[in-house]
């Protein structure tokens, strides 16, 4: 009786572990390589942090970007900023967070972050927010 329970427990643990690790690893490796290609294609420099040395300083926690000429709505900025913050937490690369916020969120990295965070079902809502703050 004890050996049957032990064997059953081992089978369940192995099945759960194999299912959990295969999906997570494939998604994160695929997403990471896509993000690396996306970020490297947009910059002419081989150094990923080279844009930080420009005249403007970039603050990761800044909610409002002074370059955005549209309607100032703190709630929309917080919502858009949250996407970039979550994307940074997903990839743990500082240039993901800063590049995501460039051009008032109207860039391909922001779109890729929406895709990687599985927010495609509310894409229109975020696009509307980007258009509102970036007019």
UniProtKB/Swiss-Prot annotation:
Q: Which UniProt keywords apply?
A: Amidation, Carbohydrate metabolism, Cleavage on pair of basic residues, Disulfide bond, Glucose metabolism, Hormone, Neuropeptide, Pyrrolidone carboxylic acid, Secreted, Signal
Species: Faxonius limosus (Spinycheek crayfish)
> Where does the entry say this protein is expressed, by tissue?
Produced by the medulla terminalis X-organ in the eyestalks and transported to the sinus gland where they are stored and released.
- The signal peptide, as residue positions, is 1-26
Which InterPro entries did the record assign? Crust_neurhormone_CS, Crust_neurohorm, Crust_neurohorm_sf, Hyperglycemic, Hyperglycemic1
PTM Valine amide: at which residues?
133
Described by its record, this protein's role is as follows:
Hormone found in the sinus gland of isopods and decapods which controls the blood sugar level. Has a secretagogue action over the amylase released from the midgut gland. May act as a stress hormone and may be involved in the control of molting and reproduction.
Supply the PROSITE patterns for this chain. Answer: CHH_MIH_GIH (PS01250)
Protein name, as recorded: Crustacean hyperglycemic hormones A*
- Keyword check for Secreted, yes or no: yes
Localization of this protein: Secreted
Molecular function as annotated in GO: neuropeptide hormone activity
Question: One biological-process term from Gene Ontology?
Answer: glucose metabolic process
Similarity-based family: Belongs to the arthropod CHH/MIH/GIH/VIH hormone family.
Q: Which residues carry this modification: Pyrrolidone carboxylic acid?
A: 62
The disulfides recorded in the entry are 68-104, 84-100, 87-113
Q: Which Gene3D superfamilies match?
A: Crustacean CHH/MIH/GIH neurohormone (1.10.2010.10)
Q: Where primarily located?
A: secreted
Gene Ontology CC annotations of this record: extracellular region
Secreted listed as a keyword: yes
